[in-house]
Amino acid sequence: MKVLLIGAGKGGSALLTILHEDKEIEIVGVVDNNPQAEGLKIARQYNIPTYTHYEKLVKKDDLDVIIDVTRNPQVHTDIGKNKPANTEILGGLSAKLIWNLVEERKKKEE
């Protein structure tokens, strides 16, 4: 599954770490308008491409999922207008739900 992560702050960084551990997920890029964002630093350590602009990336037709954790309604709307029909978007609350479920599972495994 090819995933693009938009937003590399605290939430994006946490999700990136979790997603990177899953062998069925290919993170094709991490985007943040702040080139010093923590998630971009982590992505570089994982050798994942990093970007400061998402506009061209969301139009790629080989993406399965775009995860938007920017908490910016305009970004979410823009992604929705420009993404291919077969690409799904997960917004901040959906991404947080997934993160919480994964964290709970990890706690039970310990």
Residue ranges, per PLM feature:
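Glycine-rich adenosine-cofactor-binding loop
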Residues: 1-17
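Rossmann-like NAD(P)-binding element
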Residues: 56-76
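Short, well-ordered alpha-helices that flank and scaffold nucleotide-derived cofactor binding pockets
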Residues: 17-21, 81
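Short acidic-hydrophobic, aromatic-tinged amphipathic segments that line or gate anion-handling sites
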Residues: 49-56, 90
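Rossmann-fold NAD(P)-binding glycine/threonine-rich loop
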Residues: 39, 73-110
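NAD(P)-binding Rossmann-fold cofactor-contacting core
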Residues: 22-46
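Short active-site oxyanion
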Residues: 2, 26-29, 62-66
